[in-house]
């Protein structure tokens, strides 16, 4: 039944919540496979907050013990991600976790910002707020994701 419902949709949107609980519920009910099949059929997967970052290999999340720490994602998108990076403490910790080798290179997304991925690659950044952006973070650098996308496109 769920396969039929998801198969008829053009977009799946996750509104967020507790990232760890959400991923565990998805695993328990085999929804990760359903979402993967939908993704492979071209259905758009989207979300905000926890719902935006769950698709990555790794997440910086406060959903376990209310403290920011690395959390395994569902591996649809390479690297790591954190939402709410307009909170400077979260952004600093994300950068620190990457520099320390606890997270792979990744994307930090400010509140009010959306990132469009096509075939697993970031291709557009949209912001509804002035001075809010998304960033590509490595062990050595933090740059605007828009700049990183321009470099990818040569």
Predicted regions and their residues:
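Alpha-helix/helix-capping structural signal
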Residues: 17, 50-51, 113, 120
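C-terminal and late-domain segments of enzyme folds
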Residues: 59-61, 65-154
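Single conserved hydrophobic/aromatic residue that forms the stacking wall/gate
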Residues: 1-7, 11
């Amino acid at each position: 039944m769920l396969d039929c419902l998801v198969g008829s949709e053009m977009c799946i949107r996750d509104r967020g919540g507790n990232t760890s609980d959400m991923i565990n519920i998805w695993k328990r009910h085999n929804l990760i496979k359903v979402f993967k099949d939908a993704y492979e059929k071209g259905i758009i997967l989207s979300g905000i907050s926890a719902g935006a970052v769950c698709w990555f290999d790794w997440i910086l999340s406060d959903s376990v013990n209310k403290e920011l720490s690395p959390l395994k994602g569902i591996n649809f998108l390479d690297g790591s991600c954190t939402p709410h990076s307009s909170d400077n403490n979260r952004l600093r910790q994300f950068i620190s976790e990457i520099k320390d080798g606890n997270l792979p290179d990744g994307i930090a997304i400010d509140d009010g910002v959306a990132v469009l991925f096509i075939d697993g690659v970031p291709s557009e950044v949209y912001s509804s707020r002035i001075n809010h952006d998304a960033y590509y973070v490595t062990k050595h650098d933090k740059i605007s994701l828009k700049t990183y996308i321009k470099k990818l496109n040569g």
